[in-house]
Amino acid sequence: MIQHNCAFCVAVACIIDFCNPCSIQHYYHFVAELLFGFWRTYSSLDPSISDSGISALSTPRRIWFVHLDASQWRDPPRLNEWVLRSAFPSLTAEYSNDWIDRAELGRPFLLDRVLFSDRAASMQGKHEHKVGRPLAEACSLPGSLRWWSPIARNALQFAGLVDESSMVATGPPVITYISRQKRGGRMLVPEHHERLVEELYSLRDKYGYEVNVASMEKLSREEQIRLAARTTVSVDTYCKRYSLCILRCRL
């Protein structure tokens, strides 16, 4: 007997994303909204995540980009794929053509555990209306105080920071000014940039602070993550660059 109505089980945790390319091809939107919101939601299932990032949750193994092809979720600095692969080394991705393939098979797939991600839908939530941020809905859920630790620790270890002793915990503050002067776009007028650098270095000389004037486009992705993890105070002319700092373990 041939059965045509049976479902085929996909027995792994799966993310199904409905975002369009314009809302995902930037590190801020992909990591600081989609990934951050996904894990904040998923981690609410385990209120006992430890400081060391140990969780009873199964690691997501699939992400399906329903409306994107393989190139449309990547950002120019290529941080999106770096963070996703470092956070979930075993994750596999499927794209719009794969979604069509599955639909055309004419068979249902039973997902063991699935989380739907839709930025446009989250903007209709009551919490988002209060603060104007799609993440507000996910952040309203209960959860462990260390809910982000599993993601941050995976990414930091991937960047070569083995544990928190590699980060600044004691000692002088680390001030990082992310300069955009050579990149163009949102940047300070030259004289204001020079004055800011001068004043930051005066803090270094007077108080012993570590001061970094960094052009991120000159650093590798690992170097960017390591610098962000060590930074105590970040200074930038463009707020979305601060989203690198979310990979610090303690938020």
Locate predicted features.
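The feature primarily captures lumenal catalytic ectodomains
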Residues: 1-251
